[in-house]
Design a protein with these regions (language model features):
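Small/aliphatic-rich secondary-structure junction motif
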Residues: 2-67, 173
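Structural beta-alpha unit
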Residues: 1-3, 45, 83-126, 163-173
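Short glycine/proline- and acidic residue-enriched helix-loop micro-motifs
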Residues: 61-75, 97-100
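Gly/Ser-rich helix-loop-strand patches that form or flank binding pockets
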Residues: 4, 116-168
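Phosphate- and divalent-cation-binding pockets in alpha/beta enzyme and binding domains
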Residues: 20, 113, 135
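Short, surface-exposed alpha-helical segments at coil->helix boundaries
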Residues: 71-87
Length: 173
């Protein structure tokens, strides 16, 4: 028997294709009466680069960002998601904001954070956008997509790049 899909992890880097993949997450959630957990993983900056950046950080922006722990990012993401849902609801009429159960901003390697969040939130499936950049894209998956596929036992939906007419956007981050 195929397990029920009641919770979906939608992992995003806010690239053009990941926002297109969000449409698939919303559609799947609506059809299956499921909830969506949105994850945005921020990869840590290597120490040697961070040291250089801090030399030029006169106003303490980097320090405040570390202390803040992503709270501003979560609010920004929530606002972008609400804007996207309003546009989508105007197009198709069905609501989408109530399908989102949680928004997570985490700091760490994206593959590790996706797998950890999928387990912690008890998600049934994972939805990722597949960038498909370059002439070898038909042979190799992106490092995040490939890493998730290799290390998870959960179903993973890889959403390919949209055509320009199907493109959607959550706005500039």
């Amino acid at each position: 028997m195929v397990p029920e899909i009641k919770k979906i992890l939608y992992a995003t880097d806010f690239s053009h294709n990941s926002t297109y993949a969000f449409s698939y997450a919303i559609d799947m959630a609506q059809k299956r009466d499921a909830q969506i957990v949105i994850l945005h993983a921020i990869e840590p900056i290597p120490p040697q680069i961070m040291a250089r950046l801090e030399m030029y950080d006169n106003q303490g922006v980097l320090r405040r960002a570390r202390i803040n722990g992503g709270n501003e990012d979560i609010e920004l993401i929530k606002n972008r998601v609400k804007e996207f849902c309003k546009k989508r609801e105007a197009q198709i009429g069905s609501p989408c904001v109530e399908r989102i159960s949680k928004i997570v901003v985490s700091f760490g390697h994206p593959v590790d954070e996706i797998l950890k969040t999928a387990d912690e939130e008890r998600c049934d499936v994972i939805i990722l956008g597949n960038h498909g950049k370059g002439f070898l894209s038909h042979t190799f998956l992106g490092s995040v997509s490939g890493g998730v596929l290799q290390r998870t036992r959960k179903p993973v939906f890889m959403i390919p790049l949209p055509s320009e007419k199907d493109a959607v956007d959550l706005g500039e981050m």
